[in-house]
Amino acid sequence: LLTEVETPTRNEWECRCSDSSDPLVVAASIIGILHLILWILDRLFFKCIYRRLKYGLKRGPSTAGVPESMREEYRQEQQSAVDVDDGHFVNI
């Protein structure tokens, strides 16, 4: 963090050391550090994070109380839908 701030005066540049005991400076420093850490983590793991947000939350309807045969039929329907979607991609 920057602890020295150069401010122009009428005659010359003087070096004014900011006092880090100021609560506003402390809060801004903490927020800045947290923002930097979160940004770095986001850039490093964005594929994993957004894939999980996109597909992890779509788990389908609850299967509580549904017979196993119907669950298996539902799984096969979902898989066949995925297989059909794969046919739309063209390899170049």
Swiss-Prot record:
Lipid attachment points (S-palmitoyl cysteine): 48
Name of the gene: M
The entry's keywords: Disulfide bond, Host cell membrane, Host membrane, Hydrogen ion transport, Ion channel, Ion transport, Lipoprotein, Membrane, Palmitate, Phosphoprotein, Signal-anchor, Transmembrane, Transmembrane helix, Transport, Viral ion channel, Virion
Virion surface topology ranges: 1-20
This protein's domain notes: Cytoplasmic tail plays an important role in virion assembly and morphogenesis.
Compartments (UniProt record): Virion membrane; Host apical cell membrane
One annotated Gene Ontology cellular component of this protein: host cell plasma membrane
Protein name as annotated: Matrix protein 2
Activity regulation statement: The M2 protein from most influenza A strains is inhibited by amantadine and rimantadine, resulting in viral uncoating incapacity. Emergence of amantadine-resistant variants is usually rapid.
Keyword Transcription regulation among record annotations: no
One Pfam family recorded for the sequence: Flu_M2
Sites annotated Essential for channel activity, seems to be protonated during channel activation, and may play a role in the channel gating and selectivity: 35
Residue intervals on the Intravirion side: 42-92
Modified residues (Phosphoserine): 62
Gene Ontology molecular function, alphabetical: channel activity; proton transmembrane transporter activity
Provenance organism: Influenza A virus (strain A/Teal/China/2978.1/2002 H5N1 genotype W)
Top-level taxon: Viruses
UniProt miscellaneous comment: When the channel is activated, one or more imidazole moieties of His-35 probably become bi-protonated.
Stated family: Belongs to the influenza viruses matrix protein M2 family.
Quaternary structure and interacting proteins, as annotated: Homotetramer; composed of two disulfide-linked dimers held together by non-covalent interactions. May interact with matrix protein 1.
Region described as Disordered: 60-86
Topological type in the membrane: Single-pass type III membrane protein
Site feature location: Seems to be involved in pH gating: 39
Transmembrane spans: 21-41
Record function comment: Forms a proton-selective ion channel that is necessary for the efficient release of the viral genome during virus entry. After attaching to the cell surface, the virion enters the cell by endocytosis. Acidification of the endosome triggers M2 ion channel activity.
